Amino acid sequence: MPSRRNVLKQLAAIGALAGLGNLPGKAFAADGANPEESALASANTPFHMPEESTFQTRVWVAFAASAAIWGRDYKEVQATIGRLVQAMVPYTQVNVLCREAEQARARQLCGEQNTRFIVAELDDIWLRDTGGVFVQNGEGELGLVDFNFNGWGDKQEHEQDAGVAELVSKQADARYLQSKLTGEGGGIEVDGNGTAILTESCWLNSNRNPGMSKAQLEAELKANLGLRKIIWLPGIKGKDITDAHVDFYARFVRPGVVVVNLDNDPESHDYEVTRQHMAILKQATDADGNKLELHVLPPPLDGRDNRFSRSRDFAAGYINYLPINGAVIAPEFGDKAADSYCHELLARLYPGRDIVQINIDPVAAGGGGIHCITLHQPA
């Protein structure tokens, strides 16, 4: 599988964008902040991150592709986001963040059925990473953890995107909770019952959490997300802008059941990495001591040949799908056998849900997928 988003590393700062104006500063970053709001480091925090396929209130996307980042492809990327929104709205409400100057185009491409458009200042489309992580507590209160997005270790301009999580929390009427850690939502996979799968290459990285030990990082993540156990995969540093987010390697379907990416292209750097991950997951147990049931979902080997798929960053991974109410939204890459297997496997793993596959080649050329550009809000 080609690497992800290398092409974005060299981007210069983007000019000011039309929108809401400057977002307020981080609410609880300073020492001595309100302990009720910022004490995410406490092991007794009532908040936990639900498993993704549980019932959702809505899905968020960022209609933010620009020529500054995407060059000549930005209109195709915008159209792909519109196609994704239209695939989701029969099943769930979609909130679309967009720049003020692009509202008309966003409405044209996304449609206005079951959608809400929110003006925001944005750098890029990767809302899974910029929008924070929704959590809940035992009283049904919704929270949102801000993991202090820093452009995947200052690899990309992120002045506007650094404020998106706080914006989302306000728009969702969720309690804003700021972590001590720096990371991204695409780097977190949970079963909703206390177990998470993470990659060391992403979280134990000096470009995000310098000087922090594994034990310190685990303690903070467990407090932030209500975890009892973390299964660590090695990942791989420096091959893509994210340093190997877990949402391209392993996904929980429900507690005890995991979909695993196994790259069968011997020329891919992920060929060995995914086999290391498989070996670890075969031996792993969840927070309750149960072995994991693993299902392999390999990338396509014979997909469409176009200018997008020829990008060295083309992310041809089915595993980056999104479960929503009544459906699973997944990519198709023009490899008939692989596309069909993806559909068949997801139909077995998510019974009773429609499996909707769409062409995401323009987004995949930027190194991401459907999961990367969406943010689900639990009910």
Range-by-range predicted roles:
Residues M1-S3:
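Secretory targeting signals
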Residues N6-F28:
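N-terminal export signals
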